[in-house]
Amino acid sequence: MSAVETCADGLVLRLYIQPKASRDSIVGVHGDELKVAITAPPVDGQANAHLVKFLAKQFRVAKSQVLIEKGELGRHKQVKIIAPQQIPTAVAALTE
C-alpha cells in the first residue's frame, strides 16, 4: 500500500506524525508513509485535533471532512480526506 491512495469519495493517506515540531509541514515520504510535522504536543488529543485542522487547511476542506480512520493513539495514522478541493504538491507527486 502506498502513502496516498485515491478512493471513490476522496483520498486515503497513510501518515507518520512528528509532534512538537518547530512548524507545521508535510515533510515528505517516510518509508511507505507520508511524514507530517505538527507543532502540537501528543497530549489529550491535542496533536490529533491540530493534525485535522492542518490537513483541512492544506486540502481546503471542512474539518469534518478529515477523518482519522486508524491510529488515534499512535504516530502511524490512516486519514481519509473527503472531496479535497486542493491537493498539496507533496501529496500530488505521490498520486501520479
Curated annotation (Swiss-Prot):
Coiled coil, from the record: none
Q: Superkingdom of this entry's organism?
A: Bacteria
Q: What Pfam families does the record point to?
A: DUF167
- SUPFAM superfamilies hit by this protein: YggU-like
Q: Which GO terms describe its cellular component?
A: cytoplasm
Similarity remark: Belongs to the UPF0235 family.
Note the NCBIfam families from the entry. Answer: DUF167 family protein (TIGR00251), PRK05090.1 (NF003466)
Write down the PANTHER family for this protein, in alphabetical order.
UPF0235 PROTEIN C15ORF40
Q: What is this protein called?
A: UPF0235 protein KPN78578_33230
Highest classification ranks of the organism: Bacteria, Pseudomonadati, Pseudomonadota, Gammaproteobacteria, Enterobacterales
